[in-house]
């Protein structure tokens, strides 16, 4: 779905030659792309939940809490300082929430598999999720400040995130 999101974004920008509306069809695909990934990771995590020790669960909860606090400390002041329509506010807020859910699943899974043979791909996946959190926060910050442009630093961070996700899935495939 993220391929469809990127394709629709490119269609607006390169084919139609217009500023990409926000929210747009691309946002439907970006947001929709999280759902199968989160469902799959949730099912994967659920399968191995019995291997989670209380100590590791506590550590994972602390890390997720810190990540959530940092993300919200940057997002909420910027979002509430703007005079947004309800649709824009919901769209702006859903990205960090979904990013944090993805990161949380990665951290919880890493807490289960840490020290094991398949921990490497979870580290990479967590890095990709972290890059997504950073890129989305930076995007929202730039849009709020009126400094966003296509091809900026946030877009490079997204591309790096895609690359790290691909590397994670490649590493996981090589483990079997």
Where are these regions (language model features)?
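Polytopic alpha-helical membrane-helix bundles and their juxtamembrane interface segments
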Residues: 1-176
């Amino acid at each position: 779905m993220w391929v469809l999101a990127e394709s629709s974004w490119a269609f607006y920008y390169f084919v139609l030659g217009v500023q990409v509306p926000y929210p747009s069809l691309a946002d439907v695909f970006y947001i929709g792309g999280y759902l199968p990934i989160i469902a799959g990771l949730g099912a994967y995590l659920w399968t191995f939940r019995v291997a989670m020790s209380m100590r590791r669960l506590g550590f994972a909860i602390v890390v997720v809490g810190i990540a959530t606090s940092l993300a919200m400390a940057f997002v909420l002041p910027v979002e509430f300082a703007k005079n947004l329509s309800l649709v824009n506010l919901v769209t702006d807020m859903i990205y960090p929430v979904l990013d944090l859910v993805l990161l949380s699943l990665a951290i919880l899974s890493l807490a289960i598999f840490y020290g094991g043979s398949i921990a490497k791909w979870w580290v990479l996946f967590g890095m990709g999720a972290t890059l997504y959190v950073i890129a989305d926060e930076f995007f929202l910050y730039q849009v709020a400040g009126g400094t966003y442009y296509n091809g900026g630093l946030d877009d490079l961070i997204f591309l790096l995130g895609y690359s790290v996700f691909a590397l994670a899935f490649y590493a996981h495939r090589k483990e079997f």
